[in-house]
């Protein structure tokens, strides 16, 4: 996570471990316009794992069972990372909206760079 980035949401998510037993591990998560950062402790003293939106393809497999919402983040190299959150926290929706906003901005920038900086797009009426 870059210093000075505006925080969209901060709180607890559970990530399924990659090992054979696949335990759910609680992580302190910080969502910004650029990434989702996962800290192993609540004090943010340990090194975080940062999932940059440029390396995320989509949020997939949203399923609600009991008090949890389960979802999967799919990376651009097709790695799947499983998460769950409490139903009322709506982490899956916040991550999805931030990812869509990031992807839309990237698409507009790509379009503008292909068209040249002098071309303007007319607003929809």
Curated annotation (Swiss-Prot):
Its main location: cytoplasm. GO terms for biological process: positive regulation of apoptotic process. The keyword Membrane applies. It is a peripheral membrane protein. InterPro entries: PH-like_dom_sf, PH_domain, PHLA1/2/3. Keywords: Cytoplasm, Membrane. One of its GO terms (cellular component) is cytoplasm. One of its GO terms (molecular function) is phosphatidylinositol phosphate binding. It is found in: Cytoplasm; Membrane. CDD domains: PH. Pfam families: PH (PF00169). Residues 7-100 form the PH domain. It comes from the Eukaryota. Plays a role in regulating placenta growth. May act via its PH domain that competes with other PH domain-containing proteins, thereby preventing their binding to membrane lipids. Belongs to the PHLDA2 family. This is Pleckstrin homology-like domain family A member 2. It comes from Xenopus laevis.
